[in-house]
From Swiss-Prot:
The lineage of its organism: Bacteria, Pseudomonadati, Thermodesulfobacteriota, Desulfuromonadia, Desulfuromonadales. The gene is rpsH. InterPro entries: Ribosomal_uS8 (IPR000630), Ribosomal_uS8_CS (IPR047863), Ribosomal_uS8_sf (IPR035987). It comes from Pelobacter propionicus (strain DSM 2379 / NBRC 103807 / OttBd1). Keywords: Ribonucleoprotein, Ribosomal protein, RNA-binding, rRNA-binding. Belongs to the universal ribosomal protein uS8 family. This is Small ribosomal subunit protein uS8. GO terms for biological process: translation.
Amino acid sequence: MSMTDPIADMLTRIRNANMVKHQKVDIPSSTMKVNIASVLKQEGYIKNYKVISDNLQGILRVYLKYIDDKDGVINEIKRISKPGGRVYVKADEVPTVKSGLGVVILSTSKGIITDSAARKAGLGGEIICTVW
């Protein structure tokens, strides 16, 4: 059976692994998922990630980050734009999360970037998810 929303599946796997304090989580890989993981690492929400080749689509292994080995750095990770209802914003309408404490991840013409990078570059795009 094909997956309707692979990005939502990735975010759900990260959310579930974070709640049960797993050190790592394996996700079927894709270019977009690797780009999202890169932004999460850059913003300090995950320790690291790596792509493992399995001669099929590959596996994206995400290493989760915890505060004092008990509380997850990610409090909430939420899919915004879905296959049934895409959410696009103009450059001057890019939202903030928790008054700037969180991050909005957008898909723009320049790739997958954060809300602050989109504002600096004057770019709008599709809101993939919010993290805080």
